[in-house]
Amino acid sequence: MFFVYRSNQIDILFTKICKIIKKKPLLNIFEREIIIHDNEILFQNLNTFIANHTGIAADFKLIYPNVFIWKLFKQVFSDIQLNNIFSRSTITWKIMKIIEENDFCKFVQKKDKIMKKFEFSFLMSHLYQQYILYRPNWINMWEKNKKNTLKIEKKDEWQAKLWIKIILYTEKLQQSKWHFSNLFKKFKTLKKIEHIKFPKRIFIIYSISLNPKYMEIFKKISTYTDIYFLSINACEKKIFHISFAKNYVVQKNNLLMNLSEKYEKFYFLFFKKFKKIKYNNFFQKNNSNNLLNIVKNDFLNFKEKENLLKKNSFLLKDNSISINICCDKKHEIEVLYNKLLSFFNEDSKLKPSDIVITSFSLNTYIIYINSIFKSKNKKEKIPFYISKKHSDKIEKILFIFNKILNLPNIRCNNEEILDLIEIQDIRDKFDISEEEINILYEWIEKANIRWGLHENEKQKNNLIFIKKNQNTWFYGIKKLLISHAINEEEEVWNNVLSCTSINTSRTELIGKLINFIKVLDQWRDKLFFSKKIKSWRPLFLCFIKDFFYKNEKIRDSIDIINKTWTKMIDDATLSNYEKKIPISILKKKFSHIMNNFSEKKFLPGVINFCHPSLVCYIPFKIKCIIGAEYQEIPKKKLSSFNLIDKYPLTSDLHICKENYIFLQNFISTQETLYISYVGHSLKNNNKVRSSILIDQLLNHITSNFYVSEHHDYKNNKKEIFEHICKKHKKENLYEKKQVNKINLNTLQKTKKINQEIYNKIFSIKNRIISTSTQISLKSLISFWKNPIRYFFNYTLNIKLKIAKRNIITEPFSINLFDDFKISNIIFKKILNNESIKDEFKKIILSGILPYGHFGSILLKEKKKEIENIVKAIYKYRISSPKKENFDIKIEKYNINGCLDEIQNTGLLRWKLGTINYRDRISLWLEHLIYCILGGTGESKIIGYKKNFFSFYPLSSHLAYNYLFTYIEGYMKGMKNPLLLIKSGSNWFDKVYDKKNDCIKKNDDIKRKAYKILYHTWMGNEYITGEKEDLYIQQIISELNVKKICKISQKWFTPILKHQKK
């Protein structure tokens, strides 16, 4: 017998299961109750429910619908060998084989690249799998070569021809041609099912993946066993029944109709055509105590209120449904976290297990969930679990496996290889410690290893480079070995330059590095060339052997992945595809298989994050749906080839899957439904629409509720919208524009390092600051070059050292440090009229320079630039330079130090780079001392590309007053940080009017000056902004432009005022 139990609550249906089991217990105590469903979480919930509510220890067995049907076919047709030859993987490779030999379709040709052929085959295999399940009549007709009887357009008939070729090819391989479509047809023709022992009863809980054809099979076997079909319905009425339809005109925007039309329509028509079906309705009205339950009751009774007298009053205190519009995904999780805290604060009885958070695009939120839910303080920590596709162990292995499979596609630059070494499992395999990682970074930088394992790699990658070892891993290792052997700095041996300052006690680390690079080289060779499918079969186990210690902790995970890999290869082998294939195709195929794999775990006692389908029937007090944008619910489907979408049927329930899941989550929410989505595009800040389902829900509420009888529809709608839809703004919007791009991870690390010390020191009102009146010129200059860093280093004794592992990966440019080093070497030689031939050879062999002629040109240009600087120095270095020690008294302070390079014309300074504000302030302070000591010349500094800066001579009295002012500024800056920064200096350079000694009045110039300040602060992809400075980050929580400009004006005015034009 076939029983249909309908209800709007899953718990009621669970209770009915309990009563049936109690009333008609199974005679065989070893027999298990059969539950057919595809959701393990619901099955766990059923077991928990029965244990909590009845005390029955029933032995349930969960069987997936497709597994049950295939097993049934095997029993019914025991004389047929059923091997599921028509799996998606096997069909893919059979299509590949066919299109290698035939040009029968305009979309793909024999001459096309193998990846294009694979993608086409992969797509078509997916469509044929759907046709087999949802259009068995098409498949059966195609196999009889009756294409025209199906009323499919002529332009689509190529799909039928391709399927016929697949069947013919299967027969040619002497494989079974049985699949669901022809088995279903054969099963339907059976008058009697014999020699099968059916269970006493079967419980079927409806799910959207329950194929309508499966339902026909279940109906057929209900003659031999009791089938209990448990259906969760939002609506009690049979909305497609003739008697009901006459009295109700369906509105186009009716929310329930849009959500459940196909489902309701199909099952009404399906059950109507069968006899011997017993219906049992167990619907229960929701307590009408809030907006959520009133809407659910509207669904239950299928009501739409047309006039004000029938509408419900909307209470502005009601928050049972809320729609939250956020700025970005991270902000969405921050808002959610704060909302969860308020839920717990408002209800002391609320438990984490009473709340569930769902998303159709959960993977895009995982990084933010972990960072926000784990980073909050312990008092506010919320226990949570993310239901991911794979366990952490499987994810870790897959991550490394994909990295290794991608070796043929990378250039093996230093960052890519070091990223691999830093993975814990790889480090353990090659016995490399954390400390040794830091040493490797240093060695790689000194050996100038950039990219390529060896010179042949560059040819392999088809890059336009000369065959040269320079900057490769093996050449860099050779340099390290020579450095250890000769133990001297920068010596040339056999035309290889040794590295400087290499720790010779770390010989074993070079051995580990050589071993690792050799293994990578072997894998690049292994993966670089295409192979026959069978040859790829042992690949995964080889990977585990080379990169992992196979321990008990990961054994199960390795077995799961290996079984999946080998099954994929074995399925492909069944197709008899003989051509060689690249690893990129198998990588893509394997990624798809693993992405469809799901563990479906649910942790008790915490807030679970999961896909909405896992909990759509399970009641929770609070349900949260995040990521409810229009492109996510429902997801847009590309159906250019899909004939199911082109020729739809009422039975195509899977097409509206997201709608149905949303509806079920809605009706299973008990107290509060929280919905959120990102309301603005990150690309262009345009408004992003919410899901159409959210819009329809809002339309239903505004059409059926009112705030005040005195308001018209428009005003009522506006008030309801404003209450339900909450637009969340990011705090400190000004800060967001100016400061928010700070690297938050780095900042958090910094704060973690020194927050306690920082708070402790700043909490002491009377800090002990050195009040010594003895000040060295060196300290004074060091302070004014960077007052904030000096304050931290010398007043607070805090030095922020966050490791920056930014190493050069490209051989096209020189980093700033190497550029300075080269310039300094050449400068000293030219200044002292010494030969630079040997130094040039060392520089070329070091690998610092770009390849070939590029490096030679760069070196010549560098030499030319430095020669120009030296010429300028000789122009002003008329006499032999003098040096003078001094100790002068400025009010109560004694300033001591030494001035060098004193010419008759004044102080002479030079720099091999561009002159910046720190160079100018340094020269200014020295110039003040020079003038106080009686100097009457101009102090000047010569820089790169004829850059020149000088000061007019000052009277001793004026210089004395200025120096006293800067000393007082120094003493104050030692107590409280002085906000004198480059952003302010650049602003002041633009806006200062030297002629009138004031700020320029022109508004256009002012705007440009503020723009310069902003760009200096923010930086760009080439230049790091000042906002990234860790010391500044500790002082400034938001950009205070007014304060920065005021301080800059005070301290830079004397410098620009006395600057020589």
From Swiss-Prot:
One MF term in the entry's GO annotations: DNA helicase activity
UniProt-listed InterPro entries: DExx_box_DNA_helicase_dom_sf, P-loop_NTPase, RecC, RecC_C, Restrct_endonuc-II-like
An annotated GO BP: double-strand break repair via homologous recombination
Gene: recC
Extra information: In the RecBCD complex, RecB has a slow 3'-5' helicase, an exonuclease activity and loads RecA onto ssDNA, RecD has a fast 5'-3' helicase activity, while RecC stimulates the ATPase and processivity of the RecB helicase and contributes to recognition of the Chi site.
Family per similarity comment: Belongs to the RecC family.
Species: Buchnera aphidicola subsp. Schizaphis graminum (strain Sg)
CDD domains registered for this protein in UniProt: RecC_C-like (cd22353)
Oligomer and partners: Heterotrimer of RecB, RecC and RecD. All subunits contribute to DNA-binding.
Keywords: ATP-binding, DNA damage, DNA repair, DNA-binding, Exonuclease, Helicase, Hydrolase, Nuclease, Nucleotide-binding
Pfam families reported for this sequence: Exonuc_V_gamma, RecC_C
Domain of life per record: Bacteria
Gene Ontology annotations for the cellular component aspect, listed alphabetically: exodeoxyribonuclease V complex
Protein name in UniProt: RecBCD enzyme subunit RecC
TM stretches of this protein: none
